[in-house]
Amino acid sequence: MPLAQIKEREGMKRKIILIKSFCLIVAMAIGFGQPSAEKEELVLHFGYGSNMSESYMRQYTPSLKYVMNAQLPNFEIQFRKYSNNMGGGISSIIEKPGGMVYGVMYYITKKEMDELDILEDVPLGIYKRETFQVLGEDGKWYEADLYRVTEPKGPYEPAKKYLDIMISGATEHNINKNWLKKLKLMRAKYD
């Protein structure tokens, strides 16, 4: 066999080894081949109140990954739960034909979402986690979990501290400008 063919064949073998090595590294990086029990199950969460704020949420759900902005048609945000900790009303969603709730979608591990249930008083029956169809900014519909008050009361004046967190989240994710303006007007009452 001519020397040129031998060198060409050795070069091809090296390329094949490099490609296989690269594929193996990529497969390991994305978790290919791991037992399914080791892979974290993710929950798609729609945050519309204080849960719009990524910095606020990250305190409780470090796995949080922002997906995109989204909206929930035919509902509106109302402050239907009084919070002693916040000193005023905190949000829930109430059905309203033609209404719109603006928020964000995050992926959160199931384990952290279950822990968030405790923070949101789900075991006490104050809030409940439900799955809704929300419209992503990409024009597609998604099933996402959200929290809403089980037995709405009030409405109450929104808590100043709570509005600050909502405004922070809405600003952080460039949520609908008219909604942000409305939140800022509510907040201005405290200045």
Residue ranges, per PLM feature:
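Short, Lys/Arg-enriched N-terminal segments with co-localized hydrophobic residues
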Residues: 1-11
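Bacterial N-terminal signal peptides that target proteins for export
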Residues: 12-22
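Detector for intrinsically disordered, low-structure N-terminal pre-sequences
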Residues: 3, 24-25, 174
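Bacterial N-terminal signal peptides
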Residues: 20-31
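Intrinsic disorder/low-complexity segments
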Residues: 6, 21-22, 35
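Glycine-aromatic micro-motifs
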Residues: 32-191
